[in-house]
């Protein structure tokens, strides 16, 4: 994967005009998860190019890393991505500044929030995943069982990484 952090995401048409000569197969402007171009380069190497607005990560740092906001799984995945990015080009230094801000120890308030939020989702509460899985199983809804097990694992791994003060690799 190649992540392109920019002030404004270029249009799919602009990206296609720039990249098409380097690709044997390409889909420009996919938005299944993020704004991305999915390609196979002329040398046969598959490359996914994901475009992100850099200001979004300033808000993420403020909300999650500094503010201690937990999500239902994958809480620190963007932090992990920022922290471990290899900067190839940064004309303004904006992304490098965010990456440098991400080089901190795991904040205790975030660790506690992740554990509390996701632990409550695992079991012991009325809407906990264990109860959702059991209800889906009782009604014979195997698709829902699978869906809730996946959500359970997302929260479970969020807790494991937080307990160990490690960012989630996504």
Where in the sequence are the language-model features?
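Short, charged amphipathic alpha-helical segments flanked by flexible coils
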Residues: 165-170
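Solenoid-repeat scaffolds in large eukaryotic assemblies
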Residues: 144-145
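Catalytic metal-binding acidic patch
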Residues: 1-21, 38-51
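Extended, well-ordered alpha-helical segments in internal regulatory regions
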Residues: 155-164
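Conserved NTP/Mg2+-binding pocket subregion across the NTase superfamily
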Residues: 26-137
């Amino acid at each position: 994967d190649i992540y392109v952090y920019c002030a404004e995401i270029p249009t799919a048409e602009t990206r296609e005009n720039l990249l098409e000569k380097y690709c044997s197969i390409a889909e420009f402007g996919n938005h299944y998860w993020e704004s991305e171009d999915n390609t196979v380069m002329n040398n046969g190497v598959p490359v996914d190019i994901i475009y992100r607005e850099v200001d979004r990560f300033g808000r993420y740092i403020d909300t999650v890393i500094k503010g201690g906001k937990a999500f239902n799984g994958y809480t620190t995945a963007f932090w992990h991505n920022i922290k471990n990015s290899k900067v190839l080009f940064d004309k303004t230094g904006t992304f490098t500044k965010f990456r440098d801000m991400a080089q901190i120890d795991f904040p205790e308030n975030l660790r506690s929030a992740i554990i509390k939020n996701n632990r409550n989702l695992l079991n012991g509460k009325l809407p906990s995943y264990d109860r959702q899985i059991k209800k889906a199983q009782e009604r014979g809804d195997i698709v829902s069982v699978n869906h809730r097990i996946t959500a359970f694992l997302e929260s479970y791994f969020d807790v494991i990484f937080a307990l160990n003060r490690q960012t989630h690799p996504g």
